[in-house]
């Protein structure tokens, strides 16, 4: 897969950081020593962790060389590691694992989540936020355009669901706080929606296409977005964006 584009990702930095702020506010920890930010991206979520716990030893993990380089430049006091979340092993038990908009890209959550819990110290916390927009028009239309144009399915899998995550984490020995929030982002145009998803959800669909194939895909995608997202009276578009939040704390 081609590398992530930090500049494109940060074009909507405020909107992308807001869920991280709200997730962090629900973490029931006062003092922490060891923290991991899984899928840290360009370091916007890591900066929030550093602000709350300036004395903590924070490690950001991301598989993207470009994202890790951007994060290192922005936060030289933190450690950033280029690694696959599934394979990375901390040197010590973690007081907090923070994963904002990253775990949805990984398969087999029935194994992944218990594995992450096993990396926590006693009473440690796993805090997760994942986009829950697999059934939103933005993502349904990606699949429809790919089907129309005879491209293979390259999108991510849907989330396991609230009840499944509750059971997975409860059985792993955690107290679980889980909720879902839908944000309504004001977009100035349908092209702005494309700019948003091009940095994330649309990447797998476009990565192996030629330039002309990408343009053909995006032209059709734009047409379908216009049908699904009407303009408001002031010309803005409201983009519904559901997100699933989980705060799981080990009971021992």
Curated annotation (Swiss-Prot):
Q: Which GO terms describe its cellular component?
A: cytoplasm
EC primary class: transferase
Give the InterPro entries listed for this entry: Methyltransf_25, SAM-dependent_MTases_sf, Trans-aconitate_MeTrfase, Trans_acon_MeTrfase_C
Keyword Transferase carried by entry: yes
Q: Which UniProt keywords apply?
A: Cytoplasm, Methyltransferase, S-adenosyl-L-methionine, Transferase
Name the EC number(s). 2.1.1.144
What's a Pfam family this protein contains?
Answer: Methyltransf_25
A GO BP term here is: methylation
Question: What superkingdom heads the lineage?
Answer: Bacteria
Compartments, as annotated in UniProt: Cytoplasm
> From the UniProt record, which GO molecular function terms apply?
trans-aconitate 2-methyltransferase activity
The reaction(s) annotated as catalysed by this protein in its Swiss-Prot or TrEMBL entry are: trans-aconitate + S-adenosyl-L-methionine = (E)-3-(methoxycarbonyl)pent-2-enedioate + S-adenosyl-L-homocysteine
Gene3D superfamilies, sorted? S-adenosyl-L-methionine-dependent methyltransferases (1.10.150.290), Vaccinia Virus protein VP39 (3.40.50.150)
Q: Does the keyword Membrane apply?
A: no
Chief place of localization: cytoplasm
Q: Which PANTHER family match?
A: TRANS-ACONITATE 2-METHYLTRANSFERASE, TRANS-ACONITATE 2-METHYLTRANSFERASE-RELATED
Q: Which family does it belong to?
A: Belongs to the methyltransferase superfamily. Tam family.
Role this protein plays? Catalyzes the S-adenosylmethionine monomethyl esterification of trans-aconitate.
In Swiss-Prot or TrEMBL terms, this protein is called Trans-aconitate 2-methyltransferase
State the organism named in the record.
Escherichia coli O17:K52:H18 (strain UMN026 / ExPEC)
Q: Which gene encodes it?
A: tam
